[in-house]
Amino acid sequence: MTERERQIMELLRQDPMLSQGEIARRLGITRSSVGVHLANLGKKGHILGKGYVLSEQEERYIVGVGAANIDLMGRSRAPLVMEDSNPGFIGMSVGGVTHNICENAARMGAPVKLITAVGDDVYGEKIRRECQAAGIDTAGFLVAEGDSSSIYLSLHDHNGEMAVAMSDMRVLQKLSVEFLKGKNSVLRGARAIVVDCGLPEEILGYIAAAYGGEIPVFVDPVSTAYAKKLRGRLRGFHTVKPNLLEAEILAEMKITTQEELAEAAGRLIQQGLSQVVVSLGKEGVYYQDREGRCLWARGEPMKVVNATGAGDAFMGGLVYSFLQGWPPEKTLPFAVAASRM
């Protein structure tokens, strides 16, 4: 989408019934030029027909591309003792960073589609059933024959803080650029795309290059190890939500003060991002965007239920808020509240 087309789209979002003459007057261009731009927007699928109905207004859905897996979580009854058996509670659920973000957004009321890879096993079927029960469209699933579905194992202390985790996400490597090209119409029609860095670098690069210029792409680094995939490769992404350690890796600097945090976020913005949201655990959230706005959403003391899921719920609230067109002053408190539910 060209810059002029973006300007026209913004005017039509505000008033879909604007005439070509009025659009031309507001932008200071000729009416015939407006007609050409509108025709191009129609060919690209951004405008559906009379009244300049925007495709994004027909169904403002989110597409998630990334991990959906079985979560095995253990939580000790007392402080953890390393190298010993700890009495506790063990549960199984469907998880995965992108899945969790999508489920949270879906439960908030957003239309959501998920593109992921699962094995042809009972776990894969469980993932599909639970996604559908949450209101997530699973037509984009790739079922890898002979492979096991992804499994994530985490161990938490008696306060709910994660001590260590292990993951087996090999099936996710079966997602390919060719497979995603077959989902082009779904991706092209999205209002926002969500990805996580558990994806192969080739997939992350393809989504950023093919869709990032027109569709906001939200990316979660997932971990310090996976965050390295984004270092120096942020162009094409709209929003990144790192924690403090991941932000240090992305910005290639140590962060020990508020001033250094602002500097690090600024470095990431300079690489092409529209906004950076750094989660700081109990300290809250720091937000910075391309327009120069810098905001803090302070944390409040609370009992942590699951530190792993809280960040995913926050991202779900962030993407949902984007669909609603909310300003950051409303988005951040909403997303923080979502992370505490």
Each language-model region and where it sits:
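Active-site nucleophile and cofactor-binding loops and adjacent substrate-binding regions
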Residues: 89-97, 142-146, 308
